[in-house]
């Protein structure tokens, strides 16, 4: 009998906790913020065809966005 009461209590407690989570707006893990000092995206570095060779080299060195294009 005690086991049944304990299981019912735990089940009701779990349901209450789930309801509080949904009501509080919690839907999953909190996303990680972008690193400090770096922009979240680099549209200039992503447009490789518009960059000069020196700008492409700077993007490669600073941000790791390397443009491997043959300039003609």
Swiss-Prot record:
Residues 1-21 form the signal peptide. Antibacterial activity against M.luteus and E.coli bacteria. Antifungal activity against N.crassa and F.oxysporum. Presents chitin-binding activity. Belongs to the penaeidin family. InterPro entries: Penaeidin. Keywords: Amidation, Antibiotic, Antimicrobial, Chitin-binding, Disulfide bond, Fungicide, Signal. The modification Lysine amide is found at residue 71. Disulfide bonds join 45-59, 48-66, 60-67. One of its GO terms (biological process) is defense response to bacterium. It comes from the Eukaryota. It comes from Penaeus vannamei. Higher expression in hemocytes and to a lesser extent in heart, testis, gills, intestine, lymphoid organ and hepatopancreas. Traces in eyes and subcuticular epithelium. Not present in the brain. It holds the Pfam family Penaeidin. This is Penaeidin-2a. It is found in: Cytoplasmic granule. One of its GO terms (molecular function) is chitin binding.
């Amino acid at each position: 009998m005690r086991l049944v009461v304990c299981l019912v209590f735990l089940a009701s407690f779990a349901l209450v906790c789930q309801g509080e989570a949904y009501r509080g707006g919690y839907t999953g893990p909190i996303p990680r913020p972008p690193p400090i000092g770096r922009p979240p995206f680099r549209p200039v570095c992503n447009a490789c065809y518009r960059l000069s060779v020196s700008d492409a080299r700077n993007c490669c060195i600073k941000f790791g966005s390397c443009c491997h294009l043959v300039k003609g």
